[in-house]
Amino acid sequence: MTSIHETAYPRFKPDLTQRELDEIYTPNETEQRFARRLGRSNASRLYLMILLKTVQRLGYFPMVADVPPSIVSFVTKALGLKLVPLCALVEEEKSRSRRDFIDAIRAHLKIHPITKDTDKAIELAATQAAQTKQELADIINVIIEELIRQRYELPAFSRLNRTAFRIRNQVNELYYHTLTDPLPAAVTSQFDAMLTLSAGQLVTGWQQIKQDPKKPTNTEVRQYLERVKWLKSWACELPQVDHIPVVKRGQYVYEARALDAADLKAMQQNKRYALMVLLFHAQLSKALDLSLIHI
């Protein structure tokens, strides 16, 4: 899971400048008429206006306790009202007024409430984003952008976070299967053997694969070419990886490089073999590029 602060999920700034208050939270004449028409008292008109101006900024309706006092004070003055006690706003929130005001504001701003259609839009946006993105924050940002574009009210961040996490895992599993399903048993057995330190070995086969090739000296050229040949022979036994988007593929390879043999052995089998396939191809590509430059 990721933190809300790593994403574009709208939230209140801790400190607002006077200019920001003026530009974001000043109600226009149409909005003031809207509040006067629906509000029965100063407290109800103020509460309605706070909901209206904050949902315009956030895309969702906050509770009054979460609204910075500077915004409440500014909107109060903008409406030409005297100080309204916070307890009066809380009473409005507890009453039916909150639901009635939210329904009226949604209609006024043409915002769709959170329904099953919202869930469908979230799932679709997450699925499309996860095809090329691996970071949860990036997937969540795509979801937010799409919900705003379609004028949906934003659900709680935790809901977006859970959905993005679940969809990303589903997409990853599909990609992993495209790499592991074609693997013959002989290859997976050799993969497993690479994760165990055999007698006489100083490092595992996996660690040897992870070692990045360096510019070979004249005396090392033969050894280097043998490594390239060995990697090529492996590549012939492995499925291609070009169907996976470059960015996504790069993130998988980055993860594979960070894992040692013990990490891989503890991993779910499907993902383990997929990461090994991807690293084999990445190391071969790097070795071939280096050979063109230095040999």
Language model features with spans:
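Long amphipathic alpha-helical coiled-coil/heptad-repeat bundle
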Residues: 2-293
